[in-house]
Amino acid sequence: MNSKRSCVYVVLFLFVAAILVISAGMAVNQLKEQFVDIQNEAQTMNDNNIVDKLRKRNKDVIGYLEIPDTTISYPVMQKKDNPDFYLNHDIDKNYSFYGTPYLSAYCDLEKSDNLIIYGHNINGGKMFGALTQYRDETFYKKHKDILFTTKDKKKYKIFSVISVNKNDFPYWKFVMAQDEPDYDTFINKVRQYSIYDIDITPKYGEKILTLSTCDNRRGDDYRCVVFAVELVG
């Protein structure tokens, strides 16, 4: 009797597991379909036009983020009166487990020294899942540039990749440098945590772009973070 009961439990477990796997696959496909039209438009339209068009769809759109030849090609949101709203909402403000990349509510596009963008780490490289590939230096060498369009398209060059406990290094608190020593201290700290060395050191006054996602393989408090400096001229 116990043997039969165990068999029933095993069958039920496998059935539930199969349902969960299928559901997860359907959800990822739904996520892909949700952004595919936007990504196709971004490839064919002028960069400023795609941002303007998306703003008409939702005034919370503040820019468009791309890392060429990766899966990262998404609108970026910001809602200062509800900072984490897009952690679990799509561009149309509908609930979404996967959310939409969003700029920290503490950041000002024009004034901040460091623009911090958050996104979920989704299996298959969706949303900011591709950021974890930067733990491999070979991947970095093939994808050194980040494009972020707001009023104009700006190019950023990656200078550090870290995987860190957010409580050990609260990088997310640095938005505006108090002075040059404060800026340099932050940059040195970032480079100290770098997984591998990159021969680029931002100078005071240069704008930083920070992309942050969960590093699921290390634990709930760990983040995989990519830092880049704006190229001017």
Residue ranges: model-predicted function:
Residues 1-16:
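N-terminal Sec-pathway targeting helices
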Residues 20-233:
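Solvent-exposed, non-transmembrane regions of membrane-associated and secreted proteins
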